[in-house]
Amino acid sequence: MKKLLPEELPLPPLPELVKGVMANRKELNMNDIVGTHDILFICLDCLRYDVALAEQENGGTPVLNRYGLWEKRGAPGNFTYPAHHAMFAGFLPTSLEPTPMTKKKMLFFPKGIGMGRVAPPKAFAFDEPTFVQGLERVGYKTVCIGGVSFFSKRSALGKVFPAMFQQSYWKPSFGCTVKESPDNQIAKAIEVLEETFVKERVMMYINFDAIHYPNYFYLDGVRKDSLESHAAALRYLDACLDKLFSAFKKRGQTFVIACSDHGTCYEEADDGYLFHGFNHEAVTTVPYKHFFL
């Protein structure tokens, strides 16, 4: 009988998954990770927490489910541009549990800014404008695979985020109007990894925009975006991720940050709220997890 690899094993029932994740969860020291691990930051742009949770529970995202449960967190912005400025500065989606400012846990910390200007002891502290550039300073090759138009480099605004990285890539086939955009983005990511020495540490950011509007084409015979097509886009993206994770595993140890930057609305409450760019519970509540490959 063939021995199954860990990634081929069936997902345990959700209560057992919860138990296992909580039992093995430890507070991270990013100073032990930086320099020894590749770092992969994937943003599932526009993903709602409630949809992520539903797909997690019904088994619609088997790849992501292997790496623990989504946490319910607060978005750092209500659309892509402000959210990414915050995240690249180290302010990732935050816990919704009441926590004093000075006791908040951070993976990356900008020196001299807030929280008493003292870095949490287990955070990677940096002087640069972004933690991406902070990682570059300590020897990382930094790579951006763009998705939505804020990463397209086709306008002055679309060049701001790519300029934070040593290497940045975008082409129309990575855009949110292309159903196969995650396949195309991952193909480019793997190409970059194959051109990189194994001993060279990589920090890669990918802005997956499959879930961003329009997403109706992930359901047959549909011409309008909805919560159902939002979920279908997430399932499509999840099925693509195994190739990406396998490529990183070949290089050695990898630390992964996976989250949404903001959620979105579909007028499902007949309240007139459509998409995002405003404060609404569906927009400001996002899924987050980090894990090791």
Regions from the PLM with identified roles:
Residues 1-293:
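Catalytic domains that recognize anionic headgroups
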